Amino acid sequence: DRLRQVAQRTKATVGVLNQFGAHDELLFDGRVMVAEPNGSLTHLNAGWQPGMTVLDWDNKESHAEPDPLDELVHALACGISGYVRKTGHESVVLGLSGGLDSALVATLAAIALGPEAVHGICMPSRYSSSGSLDDARDLAARLGMVHLHEIGIEPIHEALRQSLQPALGEVAGVTDENLQARARGVLVMGLANAQGLLPLATGNKSELAVGYSTLYGDMCGALLPLGD
């Protein structure tokens, strides 16, 4: 829209080109666009990939603007692949809870790196439903993930509860819930360290805004794709 407005205001053909790639939270789409004084978009490359674009100035065919949702998916995938590559990694690992956040992060990682480069860990506790575990397995199958580990956290959770009982007595409520989340974080980091994987956190921006994420739990990771 801004490019169109500049072309209309200046009554001139205006072009813009952008670099491609990710630099931490800064994402560049590699777009080449040209707008005419009448507001039409006459040149638009595919974007989100390196390459060279040759413009035919005689071709005035109008192009529709990219779909915002497609752009968001491409941007997040670009951010993941760029960060993973620049930190010297090839594959990632994340916890799969059967919920939407981890499903979305796993999907974005599969788009960015290929499903064979995405390692998932299901970490059920006594409170986990069979449906959650089934959903995580189904997600991995649909994405074509070849690395899916199932590690129960009950022994770790119970050991932590027993360790805290002399100091706290009954371990319940938020403290008990967060122990489970942090036990999962330890397992994700353990697999990451042992196999040279980059851990992805699965919290989202809304949770961060209201303090709902668990420090060292679902915030545990080198990159938080849904953080912004």
Predicted regions and their residues:
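Active-site adenylate/phosphate-handling loop in enzymes that bind or generate adenylated species
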Residues: 1, 113, 143, 167-228
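CN hydrolase (nitrilase-like) catalytic-core segments centered on the catalytic cysteine
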Residues: 1-48
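General beta-strand structural signal in soluble alpha/beta enzymes
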Residues: 14-17, 43, 94, 150, ...
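Catalytic P-loop NTP-binding/switch module of NTPases
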Residues: 41-42, 49-75
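A conserved beta-strand->alpha-helix junction
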Residues: 47-56, 117-122, 126-175, 181, ...
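Phosphate/ATP-binding catalytic cores across multiple sugar-kinase/actin-like superfamilies
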Residues: 68-93, 185-191
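Conserved helix-loop functional segments at active or binding sites
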Residues: 81-90, 111, 115-118, 162, ...
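ATP-dependent adenylation/pyrophosphate-handling site
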Residues: 90-96, 100-137
